[in-house]
Amino acid sequence: MSRSLNLVSGLYLKISILTIVAGLVLRIVLLFNGQTSDLGFSPGEWCQVFLLGAMNDLCAATIGFGFLWLFMMSVSETKYRKPWSYIILGILAAAFCYVTFCNTIFDEYGSVAPQVASGILGFWAGTFALRLFFRGFRSYWTTVWFALIITLYVGAIVFNAISEYFFWNEFGVRYNFIAVDYLVYTNEVVGNIMESYPVLPMSLGIIVVTLLITWYLFRRDLGQADRLIGWRWKAVAGPAYIAAMLLAVWLLHFNTRFQDSDNVYVNELQANGLYKFYDAFVKNELDYEQF
């Protein structure tokens, strides 16, 4: 059990540190942006930007760790035993058929959303069937997905930092309802981005940086997915993570009270961009006086 807990806690620590470092570098870069380089901050405002900013990033990393946590909690042989295995397979097959042949919320969204949802569910159902009927495939599947999810985490952190930089250059703030609007008008936004930025070189750069960071930080962890089998470590890590996540949610919300000063840039720099995106999505409004 100790080896499993060491693996999980080590992953959380590395992802959190990477998130905080990325946030620190981003804040320093944004401070030298043309919109903020001439501003003078008081000592208290510097503390808000960097100390509260690091705390907000840690909270966001804790919440974001939930996707990897769910995957690790799902690594088990129990789901391949009768009758659970056939129940799960039936649910996945039914979900695939429903999304593929019926009118669903994905059809309301339009674009390629229905095809993407159908493809994901079909892939999930098909691969679960392979794991169910071919036992030797299970360990390989878990190892590959474990490594892939960790790589995606690193890529998401790098991609988000670069995206926030360009968004700040355009609007002088963290993500807001304009960023949410980008998701609605995806085709138009993608077209504008392709015309305005060197997307291919940037994408290749993000991929290279992601792979280098993943290999440097996680190369000893990527092949350890078999440690995740078992329930004892989950009985300890599960409640601990839920408590940490709830605390992180509360702290992120609590810290917003420090983001209402007269200096808009201090408010924005100390905030976490992903939480600002979530907040804008929930509130569904834009501060027109600010813009």
Question: Model regions: which residues?
Answer:
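Basic, amphipathic N-terminal segments that precede the first structured/catalytic domain
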Residues: 289-291
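Transmembrane and membrane-interface helices of multi-pass
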Residues: 3-287
